[in-house]
């Protein structure tokens, strides 16, 4: 029974992903070169059809339960891409409803979801007790790693029909997540949170104008956008607004830096914390001259005199919207809090 349920669950995951793709085709060329005598404007691209290899089978209205994250403090970090019980006119909600209906009809299943604030703890407790209520577990990645090291997760590369090489999976993530030739987690079109939680840096357009600062857009185009340049711009804005001789959340800052901003800057600089050896095992790789240089610059930027570090989401939004921060580091999904500002 458990084997049948497991196969059904993984078939469902594969079909959920293929339904997200909408039957798209990918434009490709034979070798990436162009004949100088060919009018390229009239050459039609070759279309390669993306196929879904799934068995023709009906599972008799079996329920497949997803365990997902409910962030009670910040709902934008909750899962909204797995289940909804009705259409409401919102794009993501209605797309999920339609997709699930297609999958349920194709496989003869019922998709269900349990949202939990501590999804990984619930998964661990159930699995330890031999409870098979949950078929697919989708905690935050750092928590998923804990479950993998404790032996609770399957090697996805061994799963029939999951087809991690398909374009609806994020191939880069899958490649990076291979540990000792096993893949315990991946992501792709099945999740929008992995995109919405991308760390970004917003800037206040009004402050750029008021202080006659260089445009971040132009700096990027001219390939002069560096950590040093960010620090230079930030220092031009920082000042003691209330004149009490102390720098607090009531003053003006070059940057409000989230708790995870240093790691984001470090990785964005092209550095890594671990690499893999020939056998796919992780090797600690901090300590090179460049990594030390990058860390020094990152810490100076995020923890220095021109940055308010780890102020919390609410304070950071208030400071930015009141024009008292040039830069703010957030996840992309946090953009909803900045609607009162002219940001870039």
Predicted regions and their residues:
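C-terminal motif of bacterial Sec signal peptides marking the signal peptidase cleavage site
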Residues: 16-19
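Bacterial signal peptide processing site
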Residues: 21-25
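Immediate post-signal peptide segment of exported/extracytoplasmic ligand-binding proteins
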Residues: 44-85, 104-105, 240, 244-251
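Short, polar/charged alpha-helical segment
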Residues: 75-108, 201, 206
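Periplasmic solute-binding protein
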Residues: 79, 148-151, 172-218, 256-278
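Extracytoplasmic "Venus flytrap"/periplasmic binding protein-like
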Residues: 106-178
């Amino acid at each position: 029974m458990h084997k049948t349920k497991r196969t059904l669950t993984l078939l469902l995951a594969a079909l959920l992903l293929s339904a997200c793709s909408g039957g798209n085709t990918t434009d490709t060329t034979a070798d990436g070169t162009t004949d100088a005598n060919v009018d390229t404007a009239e050459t039609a691209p070759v279309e390669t059809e993306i196929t879904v290899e799934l068995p023709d089978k009906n599972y008799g209205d079996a329920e497949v339960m997803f365990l997902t994250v409910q962030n009670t403090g910040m709902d934008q970090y909750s899962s909204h891409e797995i289940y909804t019980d009705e259409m409401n006119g919102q794009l993501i909600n209605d797309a999920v409803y339609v997709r699930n209906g297609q999958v349920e009809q194709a496989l003869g299943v019922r998709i269900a979801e349990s949202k939990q604030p501590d999804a990984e703890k619930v998964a661990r407790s159930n699995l330890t007790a031999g409870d098979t209520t949950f078929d697919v577990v989708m905690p935050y990645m750092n928590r998923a790693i804990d479950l993998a090291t404790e032996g609770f997760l399957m090697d996805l590369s061994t799963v029939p029909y999951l087809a991690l090489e398909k374009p609806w999976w994020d191939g880069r993530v899958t490649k990076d997540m291979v540990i000792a030739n096993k893949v315990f987690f991946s992501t792709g079109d099945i999740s929008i949170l992995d995109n919405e939680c991308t760390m970004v840096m917003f800037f206040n357009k009004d402050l750029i104008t008021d202080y006659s600062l260089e445009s971040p857009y132009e700096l990027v185009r001219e390939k002069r956008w560096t950590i040093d340049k960010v620090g230079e711009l930030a220092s031009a804005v920082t000042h003691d607004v209330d004149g009490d001789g102390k720098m607090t959340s009531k003053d003006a800052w070059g940057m409000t830096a989230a708790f995870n901003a240093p790691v984001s800057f470090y990785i964005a600089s092209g550095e890594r914390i671990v690499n893999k050896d020939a056998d796919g095992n992780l090797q600690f790789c901090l300590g090179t001259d460049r990594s030390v240089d990058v860390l020094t610059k990152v810490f100076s930027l995020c923890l220095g005199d021109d940055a308010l570090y780890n102020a919390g989401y609410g304070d950071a939004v208030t400071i930015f919207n009141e024009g008292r921060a040039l830069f703010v580091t957030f996840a992309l999904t946090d953009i909803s809090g900045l609607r009162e500002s002219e940001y870039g």
